[in-house]
């Protein structure tokens, strides 16, 4: 954990509203080469994804580009940040971010945030389907997320649908059955990007559609 998260290193749009930041490394059975075995790297975000998501959630619009309003969905909210990715060195791949899914979703991520006062838990991450199975799989991860939502029925859990959306027939609608497993949970809200064509704006870097 990092108790100085509201220091000068926090983006100005989120400054003063970070209640807690925790780096979570997932299962104790993680590979031996993982640099993160010893603990927590605090609020550092070398990748930028966490900062981007936090700004979308509660950024106050500070430092927005001229002509654009970068205010997040809930600019008055407090943030309890939980990181599931780890920056480390792999003997074969070099330095990179790796993600480890929670071993116990309820007790590892949902319950700590809930106990700290969070009532909306947004997750802009997910895992691939079980090997050999298609997207849209409802698996054990989906089940335990549903169980957590049932146990904490005043906690709204959100999950990103994933980055694998396709529009094979180019009809302007994303094809069905392309969700990550976490987003198939029944008691949560799954979130996906729209496919609106906005040629005067830059595309997101993760877009598989080219716009």
Task: Report each predicted region and the residues it spans.
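Active-site glycine-centered loops adjacent to acidic/histidine catalytic or metal-binding residues
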Residues: 145, 162
């Amino acid at each position: 954990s990092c108790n100085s998260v509201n220091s000068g290193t926090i983006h100005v749009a989120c400054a003063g509203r970070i209640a807690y930041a925790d780096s979570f490394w997932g299962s104790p059975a993680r590979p031996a080469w993982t640099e993160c075995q010893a603990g927590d790297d605090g609020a550092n975000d070398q990748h930028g994804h966490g900062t981007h998501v936090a700004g979308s959630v509660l950024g106050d619009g500070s430092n927005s580009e001229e002509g654009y309003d970068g205010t997040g969905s809930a600019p008055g909210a407090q943030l309890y940040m939980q990181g599931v990715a780890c920056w480390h060195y792999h003997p074969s791949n070099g330095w990179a971010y790796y993600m480890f899914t929670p071993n116990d979703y309820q007790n590892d991520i949902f319950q700590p945030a809930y106990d700290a006062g969070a009532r909306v838990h947004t997750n802009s991450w997910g895992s691939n389907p079980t090997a050999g199975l298609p997207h849209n799989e409802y698996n054990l991860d989906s089940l335990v997320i549903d169980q957590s939502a049932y146990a904490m029925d005043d906690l709204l859990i959100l999950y990103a649908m994933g980055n694998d959306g396709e529009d094979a027939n180019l009809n302007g609608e994303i094809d069905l059955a392309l969700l990550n497993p976490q987003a198939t949970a029944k008691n949560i809200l799954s979130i996906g990007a729209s496919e609106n064509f906005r040629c005067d704006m830059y595309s997101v870097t993760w877009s598989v559609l080219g716009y």
